[in-house]
């Protein structure tokens, strides 16, 4: 409920102000009837972003098994490039299209509450990828990312809605 969330936020803020680091479990929450429930896949990321929003943190750092967001899955395409930054909206689109680094619900929270996220590796040093509302247009690539799922390749183009390659091929076949 709101009162529990508000009270928890106050406790977290006070602990941080006192230079204490609160250890908070993720992956669980309270449903509409007050029962504790699991949040499902990506629930820990969703928890982290929700807490960052509630305490008005300047950024939420997500440590994971990869060192950032790539232009496509580096396990499939070894030449994939790591992005220094990506917009929240673009990452939300990529997550919705099957990219597995960040879950859709976490990105929805980040977008709604304007929480910047830095995706970092748990295993090696590096700057990771910054996910923010806006990126300087000078740094913005035309193609941000490519997600692959169920034999479909989906592109995210700057300023253009997501279009799948299979859709483009089907349209091209219709014309011929």
PLM-predicted stretches and their roles:
Residues 23, 96-109, 132-147:
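Short, charge-rich amphipathic segments
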Residues 128-175:
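A conserved regulatory-domain signal marking ACT and ACT-like small-molecule sensing domains
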Residues 6-107:
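Nucleotide/pyrophosphate-binding catalytic subdomain
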Residues 103, 108-132, 147-156:
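A conserved active-site cap/scaffold subdomain adjacent to cofactor or substrate pockets
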Residues 28-29, 44, 56, 67-68, ...:
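Short, glycine-/Ser/Thr-/acidic-enriched flexible segments
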Residues 9-10, 61-67, 123-131, 161-165:
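Short, mixed-charge, low-aromatic patches
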């Amino acid at each position: 409920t709101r009162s529990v969330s508000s009270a928890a936020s106050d406790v977290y803020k006070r602990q941080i102000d006192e230079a204490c680091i609160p250890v908070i479990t993720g992956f669980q929450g309270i449903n509409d009837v007050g029962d504790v429930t699991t949040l499902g896949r990506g629930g820990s990321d969703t928890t982290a972003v929700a807490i960052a929003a509630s305490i008005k943190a300047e950024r939420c750092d997500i440590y994971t098994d990869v060192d950032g967001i790539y232009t496509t899955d580096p396990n499939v395409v070894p030449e994939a490039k790591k992005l220094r930054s990506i917009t929240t909206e673009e990452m939300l689109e990529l997550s919705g299209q099957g990219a597995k680094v960040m879950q859709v619900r976490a990105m929805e929270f980040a977008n709604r509450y304007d929480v910047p996220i830095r995706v970092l590796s748990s295993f090696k040093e590096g700057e990771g990828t910054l996910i923010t509302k806006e990126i300087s247009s000078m740094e913005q690539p035309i193609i941000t990312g490519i997600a692959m799922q169920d034999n479909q390749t989906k592109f995210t183009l700057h300023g253009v809605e997501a279009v799948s390659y299979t859709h483009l091929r089907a349209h091209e076949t219709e014309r011929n």
